[in-house]
Amino acid sequence: MRIGIDLMGSESSPITLFEAVYLAAQKQRNVIFVVLATLPVVAKIRENSVFSSFLSQSPCRIEIHPVSNVIEMDDEPVISVREKKKSSLVTGLRLIRKKRLNGFVSAGNTGALIAGATLLIPMLPGIKRPALLATLPTERGDVVVIDVGGNVSCKARHLVCFAQMGAAYQRCCLGIEKPKVGLLNIGLESKKGTSEIRRAYQLLQDLQLKTKSKMNFIGNVEGRGVFEGCVDVLVTDGFTGNVLLKTSEGVSVFLLKQLKHSLKDISQLQAETILKQLHDEFDYEEYSGAIICGIDSVVVKCHGKSSSQAMLNGINGAIELVQNDFISQLKQELNVETL
């Protein structure tokens, strides 16, 4: 298995991201990691005694693929993909298209990654737009949220495709036979929301009546109900989904800080035990990035401010998707759902 890692274009240091590759390579002995970085970054990696020693001792475990350009966070997505063809991001996607990589992980420009994936990698049958799929913790386990930033605005038919992909993901990866699917809305009633959301509600309800449908559409879900775990798949447009995701990240950080302050009067051991349990469950860095769902390859988008641990989780998530043959399973699930 070959996994590509883009070290460039994020708000994190490339060396921080390479540390994740180094940690992954120590444990994932059946994986070859292809690192994409500019020559100055490659030089810094080789200047690090720990990294340099590992590269010399295990030359086949990490391949360094120098690139000459970088797509920055503030670059216009489509233009940058077309003009910066030798950037780390575009090079990684081209390697995926040529079947020289089994998966690709980047913490770079989200819009450029999605635009590049759409332009360079075939879409799955029946899917018109890719979407970012991420997971959030709830009272009853993780919920899949789709879309969390791929499409600022969506037609009703796109939301239906997102629902199908999210449900297929839950069946493939978590073994939920008939996932509960809900539309994120401002109220529970079917007449609430924008015209596209109302139309999507009707389309999903119609799909529910199909005898072969493998999802359980329960209707609209309000924001406060998301974390109660009332659904397995939460469907929304990318603008709203991204706001939900980043708000939940901020709230979790705030609550952990407040709790840490509140626990100052109990024993250090008790406090550390409680905080570790909550940190493992609610810290967004513990989750394996967002999947670009709808393309015919495994591409994972990590947080733009990823720590080495967050990037490591993204890398491990991509490896797991490839090992589980996620794309083939997703194709099969979507084929059944659209019959």
Swiss-Prot record:
GO annotation, biological process: fatty acid biosynthetic process; phospholipid biosynthetic process
Its annotated pathway reads: Lipid metabolism; phospholipid metabolism
Q: Which reaction does it catalyse?
A: a fatty acyl-[ACP] + phosphate = an acyl phosphate + holo-[ACP]
**Listed GO MF terms:** phosphate:acyl-[acyl carrier protein] acyltransferase activity
Keywords in alphabetical order, please: Cytoplasm, Lipid biosynthesis, Lipid metabolism, Phospholipid biosynthesis, Phospholipid metabolism, Transferase
Q: Does the keyword Ribosomal protein apply?
A: no
For the protein in the UniProt heading, the enzyme class is transferase
List the record's Gene Ontology CC terms alphabetically: cytoplasm
InterPro entries from the entry? FA_synthesis (IPR003664), Phospholipid_synth_PlsX-like (IPR012281)
SUPFAM superfamilies listed in its UniProt record: Isocitrate/Isopropylmalate dehydrogenase-like
Q: Which Pfam families match?
A: FA_synthesis
Where is this chain primarily localised? Answer: cytoplasm
Localization per record: Cytoplasm
**Assembly notes:** Homodimer. Probably interacts with PlsY.
Q: What does this protein do?
A: Catalyzes the reversible formation of acyl-phosphate (acyl-PO(4)) from acyl-[acyl-carrier-protein] (acyl-ACP). This enzyme utilizes acyl-ACP as fatty acyl donor, but not acyl-CoA.
- Protein's name in the database: Phosphate acyltransferase
Upper taxonomic lineage: Bacteria, Pseudomonadati, Chlamydiota, Chlamydiia, Parachlamydiales
